[in-house]
Amino acid sequence: MVLSGVDKMIRLQKNTANIRNICVLAHVDHGKTTLADCLISSNGIISSRLAGKLRYMDSREDEQVRGITMKSSAISLHYAEGHEEYLINLIDSPGHVDFSSEVSTAVRICDGCIIVVDAVEGVCPQTQAVLRQAWLENIRPVLVINKIDRLIVELKFTPQEAYSHLKNILEQINALTGTLFTSKVLEERAERETESQAKPHSEQGEQVYDWSAGLEDVDDSQLYFSPEQGNVVFTSAIDGWGFGIEHFARIYSQKIGIKKEVLLKTLWGDYYINMKAKKIMKVDQAKGKKPLFVQLILENIWSLYDAVLKKDKEKIDKIVTSLGLKIGAREARHSDPKVQINAICSQWLPISHAVLAMVCHKLPSPLDMTSERVEKLLCTGSQTFESLPPETQALKAAFMKCGSEDTAPVIIFVSKMFAVDVKALPQNKPRPLTQEEMAQRRERARQRHAEKLAAAQGQTSQGPTQDGGALETSPHEDEPRGDEPDVASVSRQPVSQEESSQEAFIAFARVFSGIARRGKKIFVLGPKYSPVDFLQRVPLGFSAPLEDLPPVPHMACCTLENLYLLMGRELEDLEEVPPGNVLGIGGLQDFVLKSATLCSLPSCPPFIPLNFEATPIVRVAVEPKHPSEMPQLVKGMKLLNQADPCVQVLIQETGEHVLVTAGEVHLQRCLDDLRERFAKIHISVSEPIIPFRETITKPPKVDMVNEEIGRQQKVAVIHQTKEEQSKIPEGIHVDSDGLITIPTPNKLATLSVRAIPLPEEVTRILEENSDLIRSMELLTSSLNEGRNTQAIHQKTQEKIWEFKGKLEKHLTGRKWRNTVDQIWSFGPRKCGPNILVSRSEDFQNSVWSGPAGRESKEASRFRDFGNSIVSGFQLATLSGPMCEEPLMGVCFVLEKWELNKCAEQGASDKQHQGQCDLAGEGQGGGKTCHVGDENQEQQDVCSEPFEETSQKGDSPVIDCYGPFSGQLIATMKEACRYALQVKPQRLMAAMYTCDIMATSDVLGRVYAVLSKREGRVLQEEMKEGTDMFIIKAVLPVAESFGFADEIRKRTSGLASPQLVFSHWEVIPSDPFWVPTTEEEYLHFGEKADSENQARKYMNAVRKRKGLYVEEKIVEHAEKQRTLSKNK
């Protein structure tokens, strides 16, 4: 660095009011990294000629090759304006949807953001996503409309057309901002209404309903983007220029003689200037007057581009002279017009000044953090700020004050961990020597040289040695000795090969309060840590070293070993970091997995989890090429899991090591990192493991050729159903409505189960509230264990009743009567989109009885048996009968549950759950039971005999089939599976929402690729003023691999898709369908050789899992020969 040294950055870090923590957000290829290059070049870190070409913040090789940013990188910049100096902590973030998790890690530690929008493409899908992320994190945005040069060079717009186009873009992004604002106001209003309804009405009087939405009472004047407010800048980052209207208002106020304040309000908008009267008036479109923005700003820029592109040297010289610029001879003679434009515009309208001035004036400092954001960061789950302990609420003042006193609590948030090579750390780099150190080295070299000469003269007087060995010196002799205090000697020690190949993990963090000092001990709080638990375990006023504190779950103590200043590709050592700054922390790899909260006070709660837009959905199994390298693979996958905020690493029940990523590009990057950085071995990667879900539907009304199912076909379907039911083992009864009645192996209990498809809306509600359902389960277990959850119980209970009300709203009708109150469990994993309903008269239990009510005596009595029933339901929903995939949208109704008295007595007596004792055979009068024939060794596998006998006077009822709870689990699982098989089964495919931008020339090819891959177009919209189309479609995840490459090849790179996981969709075709009608035989053939999509997916999953696959084989192979015989 030339202009901004580390010492200056350390000095600027102490002035919190002049710190700006910002990130650059945009759709892919809208110019984020090019803009960052321009801002970095203003500090002299890179040459201004390389800005936009070097991509300084893209330090990975694959980032440079692909031309897209894949990770968030931070750099500290210095900006001076007058007597004020500012420190800009700039974070460049990715625009590709696969890496949207990196955007989440960036916006959490920022106070503001720059939204970059392409002037040609306008507001794109990922622009909406990043703006929504910024809104959710309560950070203030400013707008940069980039690539204005494309309007001139590519689209050939006139200044008037360009002005209209820019107005449309501004209206689009303001409409999006208004939508976010409106939804927030309406949510707050709904919360207030819920609270008011919960309060009892003291007076019974006439109630008046307020029909207003509450939008009129909220000030949104500072919310929207508007050039006159100074939060919009127009730029061309590749050409190095940019401006806000404040720059031209200052110039023209002196030339025209109109006040700067007036020009600020009228330079953007439909205003024109009357030069005779020197007044600014409204534009009358009929008279063809030009707006001020066109007349005073755009026409000047257009004329400059026109002169340079036409190589009008006389006009160029005139413009340069009038602007008072100095252009070098090399740039003036250059044949590339871009070089000349960059040389002129970067001096006339420097982009760095326009953008950084807007950042300093319009974006907040760490001192301006709103109380709303502080409360949102501290309140996890369903908590409210008022429900937190008083010690925790007191931390709000520390956030707002951003104090740097010694008594201020140190609060740091780690948003992600990133890996760097050990050799790239500052302590392992050779540092330049100071003048004093160089003088000391010269003096020591002279002394050594004099000693060698003296020794050589002494040896010469005694006699020369062979080969002149006395005069030879070791090549390392001039190096400083180990005991000499030389700074460079430490860093120049050879690094072992093992150490040089290691990766060090640095925490990407921000200090919210207090001063982070090297060597300070601090608490690391996990996401499940609760300050309430700590305050209950540790007595008030406890003062001792942190190591002596009693163990508290999800809390550890660590030392801040190394602090770093993040400078893009470089790291600089720091001794301390004041509050409000972004920093890197070394030595936390053993304490932090992905993100964490660091605090000097244990009363601080962990920050709310990061909000990820993209859901990991793409799975692959990995294994080493050589089995002996499995330990390296396991270690590498652990490092990869820590280095990537979005990736998930799983070990399945089969022993497979599975990577779960957000998309195809993200998958490729993770595999490259695994091979080259973390595991450093050759690995084998399976085909993508496509997730599916199994469900049931109502019986279809039309057949496969879209004809209504008639009587004959209904008979055929019934016959087919009976054939399927005939495969069900004996002893299981199936009635006409699909009710399965199945006894346990010991005949002590009988279960009657029915499967019903849930409405789509109910399934969606269950998916959206999975976190709340999980909280209900945790609360129920907490209450059963006697733990205190009163602090959050009331707020959670309100959400539970709201969730219950939504279910009651959509589960209406005769067959769903009282269903919500009878919900016993959710599944799989007790928080999935399937429900278990208990309609048994003898046994009734409800999921609402735990968190929202009291458990009945009968439910408490049969709790052990009930847990077995629920466990069987969980197993059944975890793997369905078609291809062992989880179920979705299925309601299992337990119609009857009959228990014999023997089983009831067994439940009441715990001794009856033990195994039978062979030694008691003589005393029990034949009450023991043995399994196996006489030749086999008798095994003690039976339960203790029950004392009661049957009414018929038979021998005592003996359980020979293992523990009764295990029999209930297996029986319930089988009952659910059989209940599914007697209903029309369907597969559900994971679906991507696909946003494709393409020109009109290649629109047909895009549609062809989509239809080939089972895609479905939902919407097609043309961007106004361009020939670009935005196509919104849905595409199965199973068909998405290679989709981006194929569509780019077919369209010659003119179409670029963005894939985001959206929802699950039922595949309409029946995977077990066979032709039954004459029309179906004609259309599909006798054997239905053209197998349907669902069967293809089902068989692929079954093959992968090693399950039986029913495939067609050639019946008469010799009849396939078509070669004619020679006679």
UniProtKB/Swiss-Prot annotation:
Please cite one Gene Ontology biological process associated with this protein.
cytosolic ribosome assembly
Quaternary structure and interacting proteins, as annotated = Associates with the 60S ribosomal subunit. Found in a complex consisting of the 60S ribosomal subunit, SBDS and EFL1.
The protein's enzyme class: hydrolase
| InterPro entries xrefs | EFG_II, EFG_III/V, EFG_V-like, EFL1, P-loop_NTPase, Ribosomal_Su5_D2-typ_SF, Ribsml_uS5_D2-typ_fold_subgr, Small_GTP-bd
Q: What does this protein do?
A: GTPase involved in the biogenesis of the 60S ribosomal subunit and translational activation of ribosomes. Together with SBDS, triggers the GTP-dependent release of EIF6 from 60S pre-ribosomes in the cytoplasm, thereby activating ribosomes for translation competence by allowing 80S ribosome assembly and facilitating EIF6 recycling to the nucleus, where it is required for 60S rRNA processing and nuclear export.
Reactions that this protein is recorded to catalyse: GTP + H2O = GDP + phosphate + H(+)
**Residues modified as N6-acetyllysine:** K528
What are its E.C. numbers? Answer: 3.6.5.-
Q: Which NCBIfam families is this protein grouped with? A: small_GTP
Report the residue ranges that make up the tr-type G domain in this protein: 17-272
Query: Where is the sequence biased in composition, kind Basic and acidic residues?
Result: 438-452, 474-484
Stretch list, region Disordered: 429-496
Superkingdom of the organism of origin:
Eukaryota
Stated name of the protein: Elongation factor-like GTPase 1
Activity regulation description: GTPase activity is stimulated in the presence of 60S ribosome subunits.
Any idea which GO molecular function terms this record carries?
GTP binding; GTPase activity; ribosome binding; translation elongation factor activity
One Pfam family, please name it.
Answer: EFG_III
Recite the UniProt keywords alphabetically.
Acetylation, Elongation factor, GTP-binding, Hydrolase, Nucleotide-binding, Protein biosynthesis, Ribosome biogenesis
Record-stated family: Belongs to the TRAFAC class translation factor GTPase superfamily. Classic translation factor GTPase family.
Q: What is the lineage of its organism?
A: Eukaryota, Metazoa, Chordata, Craniata, Vertebrata
Provide the binding site for GTP.
Answer: 26-33, 92-96, 146-149
